[in-house]
Amino acid sequence: MVVHLISLLTQTLALIILSLPSIINTSQLDYDTLVFKQCDPLDANILQKATTKSPNYSNQNLFLRAQALSSFLRKLESESSRSKFLKTLVGNEKHAVSGWFQCREDYPSEICHKCVGDLREISSRSCGNATSARIHLRGCHLIYKFERIDTPGAQVNNHHKYKLFETPEHGLIHKICDGATAETFPGFEEMRTEALTAAETGVVDGHGFYEDSYKLLHVVAQCDGHVEACDCGECISSAAAAAAEECRWSIAGQIYLEGCHVGYTYHPHELPNDSYHEEGSKVNTGKSLAIVVGGVAALVFVAIFFMFLKSLRKKGDDC
């Protein structure tokens, strides 16, 4: 009996140890930190038409508008469990919402789904009355705008009748430059230029995503899912130029353009970590894994010890 229990507990411990790396890696992902949000104010023209005479029109219009946005966000959240990117248009007889969500390509599907759920909450809480919004978290982002439907009784059933956002022009949207500088480190600018140049070709080969370490820099680059390969490379090239200009001596920087974003982190005294190393995330995976495994093993051996004592006591009672 004791031998059987020991065997069972040993197998359980082995399964736990095998699953721990993925659990710890997932828990490390800083996917839900807000990077920035932009909510454009509500346009009064959306709430009323000059030809409208009904006093209840504004309330009804607000309801239909909120309904369209809610349907749009629900669809994105639902699809995020199966896809890392979705560009779509959803609406009713008065309003349509066009836009997309995108998750960081190397994050697991469950993290993508959680991240888009957070986007939906932030949008509802902070941008509920906006005509357009852009929300970026560390692990995903959301962009949408309202499309005016002027035809009475029009239904948004055929997406080809309505335009989504046009091809981006790679304009600067947001930047984050670390306050610490690398001015005293020789060769920093050249190293960053080489690392970001590698990202330009990397996103083309990687179908819009690149994450790698180059010498003492860690670089992450990604284009929006609807951006073609050649445009993606050009966008990252523009982002690299913006990083050199806007964050010249910063040891870490993030540049967000229309269509893509790029981030880099400089590690002058250590080699960058592998995948999932993001700005501000420096968790020691090996140490965490050792602590957890040790704790689980201790619990298992304590359980075996008590079972052994119980077995001896039972034998004594039988005598």
Swiss-Prot record:
Transmembrane segment boundaries: 289-309
Q: Where in the cell is it found?
A: Cell membrane; Cell junction, Plasmodesma
Name of protein: Plasmodesmata-located protein 4
Q: What is its main location?
A: membrane
**One family name in Pfam for this protein:** Stress-antifung
Q: How does it sit in the membrane?
A: Single-pass type I membrane protein
Similarity comment: family membership: Belongs to the cysteine-rich repeat secretory protein family. Plasmodesmata-located proteins (PDLD) subfamily.
Segment forming the signal sequence = 1-26
Disulphide-bonded residues: C39-C127, C103-C112, C115-C140, C177-C247, C223-C232, C235-C260
Q: Which residues lie on this side of the membrane: Extracellular?
A: 27-288
Could you tell me what this protein does?
Modulates cell-to-cell trafficking.
